[in-house]
Regions:
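Positively charged n-region of N-terminal signal peptides that target proteins for export
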Residues: 1-6
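Bacterial N-terminal signal peptides
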Residues: 8-17
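N-terminal cleavable signal peptides for secretion/export
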Residues: 22-79
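A short, structured loop/turn motif at beta-sheet edges
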Residues: 24-28, 55-64, 89-95, 203-206, ...
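Hydrophobic residues positioned within well-ordered beta-strands of beta-sheet architectures
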Residues: 32-34, 50-52, 65-67, 84-86, ...
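Short, surface-exposed coil-to-beta transition loops
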Residues: 47-52, 81-85, 109-113, 228-232
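Hydrophobic/aromatic-rich structural module bridging two neighboring secondary-structure elements via a short loop
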Residues: 67-121
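Mature, soluble, non-transmembrane domains
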Residues: 102-271
């Protein structure tokens, strides 16, 4: 799933119910590429196109995620290319996240954010940034990192739940975790025909398609998300963690992406 501002996107459940069962969910290592196009008020638009590449590898201790979003947007004289890259390592128990996020526009780097986030046994944590150096952010109890929230969404869907709320930290900015409101629903007919790319059929055989929408709310002074969401996203994801289709919507605009390539990656040999 796109988990930053463009690489990102109910029923309240007890925090223990959100976190404890997530470890039982496993996802397959894979590499996928998506074609990206513009959305205008939720409908196909013009002026923006690109590609989104996602890779998830398993290690004996956790997960390594690499993702890149490249967009070309129509300008007054010529198209302007922008690129967002993220590299993350997340522990299998969901208590540690190392992150690096880079943004370039027109071939020039415009931002870089790096750091590490740790969650203690009491559920509270802290993110420490090395870029910008010396910055820290407190993490409230039961904050979820990217892989953990994806696994929990799958767990909830397989259990027949309608959705959940969670605190979500990605590390793309020096800011508090966002409140995420996830709604799990019926797969829309218009998305039922999303095809599996040639060569990736074995990864999808016998798998259930999960559809959900998520709203991301910036934290207020009281630590809660309020008002309109900063952005929203939707996704069609297999129950082994492979995303087939997604959207990211902010204000009146946005993007949608549809899978075009899929391949399996090797699993580690762990003792």
């Amino acid at each position: 799933m796109l988990t930053a501002r463009l690489l990102t996107s109910l029923f309240l459940l007890p925090a223990a119910a959100v976190l404890a069962p997530a470890a039982a969910q496993d996802i397959v290592p894979h590499r996928a590429v998506y074609a990206v196009s513009a959305l205008d008020r939720g409908k196909p638009g013009t002026g923006t196109s690109g590609t989104y590449a996602f890779e998830l590898r398993l290690t004996c201790d956790g997960y390594v995620v690499n993702q890149r979003l490249r967009l070309e947007m129509a300008g007054a004289r010529a198209a302007v290319a922008s690129e967002q890259q993220s590299q993350m390592t997340e522990s299998r128990d969901g208590k540690k996240l190392r992150f690096e996020h880079r943004t370039t526009t027109g071939g020039k780097q415009t931002s870089i954010v790096k750091g590490e986030a740790l969650v203690g046994d009491d559920g509270k944590g802290e993110a420490r940034f090395t870029e910008p150096e010396g910055q820290t952010v407190a993490l409230p109890p039961n904050t979820l990192f990217p892989v953990a929230i994806a696994r929990e969404t799958i767990r909830q869907a397989k259990a027949g739940e309608s959705g959940f709320d969670a605190q979500f930290f990605f590390g793309e900015k020096v800011k508090a975790p966002q409140l995420v409101n996830i709604l799990i629903g019926k797969l829309p007919k218009r998305l039922a025909d999303v095809k599996i790319p040639e060569g990736g059929e074995q990864l999808a055989d016998g798998r259930t398609r999960i559809y959900y929408r998520a709203g991301f709310f910036d934290a207020q002074a009281d630590g809660k998300g309020q008002g309109e969401p900063a952005y929203e996203m939707s996704s069609v994801t297999l129950d082994n963690g492979i995303e087939l289709y997604g959207t990211h919507e902010e204000s009146d605009g946005g993007i949608e992406y549809r899978i075009t390539r899929l391949e399996a990656l090797p699993k580690p040999e762990c003792k």
